[in-house]
Regions:
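Glycine-enriched alpha-helix->loop->beta-strand junction motifs that scaffold or abut catalytic
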Residues: 1-3, 20-29, 47-54, 104-107
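C-terminal helical cap(s) of enzyme catalytic domains, especially alpha/beta-barrels
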Residues: 115-143
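Catalytic cores of alpha/beta
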Residues: 36-46, 88, 92-108
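Active-site-adjacent beta->alpha loops and helix N-cap segments on the catalytic face
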Residues: 5-23, 37-42, 61-76, 95-98, ...
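Glycine-rich phosphate-binding active-site loops on the catalytic face of alpha/beta enzymes
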Residues: 3-5, 10, 54-62, 91, ...
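Surface-exposed amphipathic alpha-helices with a cationic face
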Residues: 18-22, 72-82, 135-143
Length: 143
């Protein structure tokens, strides 16, 4: 394990965790959200090690049909506060979304959509192949 991402844990409440993680060379990664103030962005980018995680939508993770037009603008705004990579995730599931986010973010995080692809292919003899082709379509969107 290289890092910890703990939702809903702000840096000011994570002092002991950050110290313990640091002793084992484990990075702590904090979130910035569409609702984050500049003060919160400043605190979270300063406290993050490894990268900053931008939550590309409000609400819970999963898939969404379209990204808010402000996502790229917000990622660029966060980059004014840090030299660390800014990666974005939550609700990303299509090659077009990966392409759009990838135009600004240093990394694109896809989680729930891959879990969904595994679930949808759970009875298939080619589960690994089907999921691999899906993931490859996302990766290809970045090239």
């Amino acid at each position: 394990m290289d890092g910890l991402i703990i939702p809903d844990l702000p840096p000011e409440e994570a002092k002991n965790l950050r110290q313990a993680a640091g002793r084992f060379n484990i990075v702590t990664i904090f979130f910035c959200a569409p609702t984050s103030t500049d003060e919160r962005i400043r605190a979270n980018t300063k406290a993050s090690r490894g990268f900053v995680y931008y939550v590309s939508l409000t609400g819970i993770t999963g898939t969404q049909k379209a990204l808010a037009p402000s996502v790229v603008k917000q990622i660029n705004h966060i980059k004014h506060f840090t030299q660390k990579p800014v990666c974005a995730g939550f609700g990303i599931s299509t090659p077009q979304q990966v392409r759009d986010i990838g135009s600004a973010a240093d990394g694109v995080i896809v989680g729930s959509a891959i879990v969904k692809a595994i679930y949808q292919n759970r009875a298939s003899r080619d589960l690994v192949g089907n999921v691999s082709r899906y993931v490859s379509s996302l990766v290809k969107a970045l090239r």
